[in-house]
Amino acid sequence: MSQKEQTLMTPYLQFNRHQWAALRDSVPMTLTEEEITRLKGINEDLSLEEVAEIYLPLSRLLNFYISSNLRRQAVLEQFLGTNGQRIPYIISIAGSVAVGKSTTARVLQALLSRWPEHRHVELITTDGFLHPNSVLKERGLMKKKGFPQSYDMHRLVKFVSDLKSGVPQATAPVYSHLIYDVIPNGDKTVAQPDILILEGLNVLQSGMDYPHDPHHVFVSDFVDFSIYVDAPEELLKSWYINRFLKFREGAFTDPDSYFHNYAKLSKEEAVDIATSLWNEINLMNLKENILPTRERASLIMTKSANHSVNQVRLRK
């Protein structure tokens, strides 16, 4: 089969960086360099150029989709003769540990909330829906943190389902990376946002992952648009190790940090531990649970060095 025939058969439209950047059209830049600095992750070089060439075209596309969804809701209300409840448009962001999902989520939240409609955009990470450490220890799952079985999936699905059902408000637990645990009584209330951005490792999982349980309900069943942030395995590993080293010099120095003992490690020891954590936990989770869901995404952003996106694939 020729490369041209393979391209025609793919469910995705493929864009290089230059082609994607051209789709920004005339969307104005609404973020300053100072704001971008606050939005980026500890390990990322997020530039004004990256926001302009990658995230502004994406926010334009999402705005079209969201506006179309609102029109569809209005048609349904007109047909039923009702004043409908506010149903949020849900965007999910998946990808490996250290790929930059959180930065993507924060940038999109900032951009989408600054469209002329001034939409209310909430951001929730699925980390909060991890079982507390006490439960994970009891079940022998501390080394499986981030794997599907480490989450309270019932509560996560109920949270998303409630919002899609138009309930006035729903609560989401909050996770602290400092204490490496869910914050007791630290729930966040989400009250009928226009847009919900849900960021997490496994938000693209579906019934295809559980063929033995056809009645299982998944977060992906309630998502309107899904994004997978992708990068080559070797880059992910280096980003994870570099992030660990930065935490060793920063967050781990806090006496309250769960990983405070790591602050005393030499650089060589820290690299060895980070490499082991990557190989034994995060790489395994990526290969077994995260990467197999990539082709279900509405859009795949592929990163190269310095967290710069060099390819975008959009589902037809």
UniProtKB/Swiss-Prot annotation:
It is an enzyme of class 2 (transferase). GO terms for molecular function: ATP binding; pantothenate kinase activity. Pathway: Cofactor biosynthesis; coenzyme A biosynthesis; CoA from (R)-pantothenate: step 1/5. It catalyses: (R)-pantothenate + ATP = (R)-4'-phosphopantothenate + ADP + H(+). Coiled coil: none annotated. It is found in: Cytoplasm. Pfam families: PRK (PF00485). Its main location: cytoplasm. ATP binds at residues 95-102. InterPro entries: P-loop_NTPase, PanK, PRK/URK. Its EC number is 2.7.1.33. One of its GO terms (cellular component) is cytoplasm. Keywords: ATP-binding, Coenzyme A biosynthesis, Cytoplasm, Kinase, Nucleotide-binding, Transferase. GO terms for biological process: coenzyme A biosynthetic process. Belongs to the prokaryotic pantothenate kinase family. This is Pantothenate kinase. It comes from Klebsiella pneumoniae subsp. pneumoniae (strain ATCC 700721 / MGH 78578).
